[in-house]
Amino acid sequence: MNIYHKSLWLTIINATMIGRSLGTTLPPNRRHNRIKLYKKLTIEEMGKLSAKMDQHTLRRRDIHRALDKIKDAIPGISFGQAQKGLNVLLKVHWFLYHKGHPIGSELDCPLDSKVLGSLGGPQIRLARIDKPMYMTKQEEIMSHSQVRGEHRVEYDRIWDEDHLRDEGLL
């Protein structure tokens, strides 16, 4: 992992707007340092997981362990908040370098308000999502994705395409 990876990954994490969600749950006097720690840990874990993806040895349990590590290291964040940045980075890495490789079946769909809203039921904030609820949501996503012949990580591709269309890029 070099400076360019870190810079790109930081830009992507910032674009996910996870700081907004973290800002609503972290104490004001600790918010800045904890968000910095979140970004640092997410980038460190991404370095390890992207190397495994590149070697085609990445497993879903590796991702979940990394998410547990991030969540446990930062008081006041939920599993739902911990997952956002890392899952987006893994998704981007897979689409750029490994699209079509079966390793995509190991990846989860990044949860956000749009994805959660598409699953129906009451709207749930990332701050309220614990690991069991996260796993349940990923299984729901898997059911929908299988119907379309896609991996879980591709479930939110529809909104990516909509956004690009709105910007005149598709």
Show where each model-derived region lies.
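C-terminal accessory module of base-excision DNA glycosylases/AP lyases that mediates lesion recognition
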Residues: M1-G19, G23, N29, H64, ...
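A glycine-rich, hydrophobic loop/mini-helix early in the fold
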Residues: N29-A73
